[in-house]
Amino acid sequence: MLSLKAVLRFASVAVAVVLPTLAQAQAPEPSLSVRSPPVSYNNTLVKQRADPQILKHTNGRYYFIATVPEYDRVVMRQADSIQGLSTAEERLIWARSQSKAGVGYVWAPELHKIGDKWYIYFALGRTAPFDVRPFVLEGTGSDDPMAASWAEKGFITTDFDTFSLDATTFEVNGVRYLSWAQADPRFDNGGGTSLFLARMTNPWTIQRPSIVISRPDQPWERIGHNVNEGSWGMVRNGKVFVTYSAAATDANYCMGLLTADQNADLMNPASWSKSKDPVFVSNTATSQFGPGHSAFTVSDDNQSDVLVYHARQYKDIRGEPLDNPDRMTRVQKLYWRSDGTPDFGIPIPDGPHPVRLRSSADQTLYVGIANNAVQSVKDAPVQNTQFKIVEPGLGGSGTISFESTAQPGKYLSAANGSVSLATLSNTSDAGARSSASFRRVAGLSDATGVSFESAAQAGSYLVSGGNGAAVSVAPSTGAEATFYLE
């Protein structure tokens, strides 16, 4: 039987077209492929680190920066892999106690390489905890930001001297922009925060006036607090996508999405459209609450885009959410729909990252859940096509089981030639556990793929059908019994 490591290796080989990474996204008109190999991360990645960012440097190393619960310093860690950041040593980059720049909160640091220098943007309280404004550090003297010499460039001056935070920078068609959240005296009597955008004249100065690209004007953005914050810009498939977070920093915290054409005038507010509904929200089934303040990076093999965000593992918080330290850094693969738009899915459960099973017979189809039935599906919500590979499986050594991501505790189960989704986590019935188990072998029609023999029905394999057709187990040896993992 093939090991999980071998299956992931085969899956990587089977990808015919490499997905252009976010790091490559500045190239004009990137091509689109919705296919990319699976990733093998384990959540939670870093405990008690909020507002996370992971940057993959050109040397292949990953750098991690985030808000610490004490809100008093900027720390950084590095590793050769995303998973390696989980246990990497942290290094102090800047401490409020060693500076005269401010006395208040230190929030949401971000690391960026601009030219041959490093920059860290974060919110710093000037004269009081909540008197926050965007602040900039410049790192020089080393291609490694952990070894750079850091100097304070100061606060960024915006159009209004009001509460402002979460500065981020991105480049589109050779023009560098800054986006940030700020209380706008022209909206909600100066309450809440809107998202602003401006061109930059240098890494610590914007060209004024700025524009507003989003206000908290939807009901889901106004729960607890009227908030748009934590933006992140990326260019893909001829579009500029800006993710952001909304509402109070409890279980109501969620993510929205702004979109503009890459060649549009980004300084024209009319160029931007907003998602009607949030694109990433709390999920009780997976026990992840308040997901948000996202950033994006690329996988270790450079073939998948990776969503970086924070969430809590419980819903109810005692006291002020800001005083709660349990926002955890998490990572998961970002998928792309055939129309070129991102599908964020749901916050996946703790533990190993799930996979998708793409049919070798029709590579637009996936094993998925539709109307509580296991079917071959096309363009389904990504969470309905994700399964965690449990190894050893419920049937014991030498087997694996497929646990639904959207419905944890439910597994693919084969009986009498059909496949269903069954609740089996706590069952001691050996027959039921065997029915929910498979043996993994090299792809029957393509050795770079993988096939799954039923542990309960020897010689019968998991088989895909046409779009909307039931997934079954049968003694097939063709492409319909071979899958590629994503």
Swiss-Prot record:
One of its GO terms (biological process) is arabinan catabolic process. Residues 45-342 are annotated as: Catalytic. The keyword Glycoprotein applies. Pathway: Glycan metabolism; L-arabinan degradation. Glycans are attached at N42, N302, N416, N426. Its EC number is 3.2.1.55. It catalyses: Hydrolysis of terminal non-reducing alpha-L-arabinofuranoside residues in alpha-L-arabinosides. Its main location: secreted. It is an enzyme of class 3 (hydrolase). One of its GO terms (cellular component) is extracellular region. Keywords: Carbohydrate metabolism, Glycoprotein, Glycosidase, Hydrolase, Secreted, Signal. Disruption phenotype: Significantly reduces vegetative growth and conidiation, but no difference in germination and appressorium formation compared to wild-type. Significantly reduces virulence. Pfam families: AbfB, Glyco_hydro_43. Residues 1-25 form the signal peptide. Residues 359-467 are annotated as: ABD. It is found in: Secreted. One of its GO terms (molecular function) is alpha-L-arabinofuranosidase activity. The active site is at D51, E229. Belongs to the glycosyl hydrolase 43 family. Organized into two domains: an N-terminal catalytic domain and a C-terminal arabinose-binding domain (ABD). Secreted arabinofuranosidase that causes degradation of rice cell wall components during infection. Required for virulence. This is Alpha-L-arabinofuranosidase B.
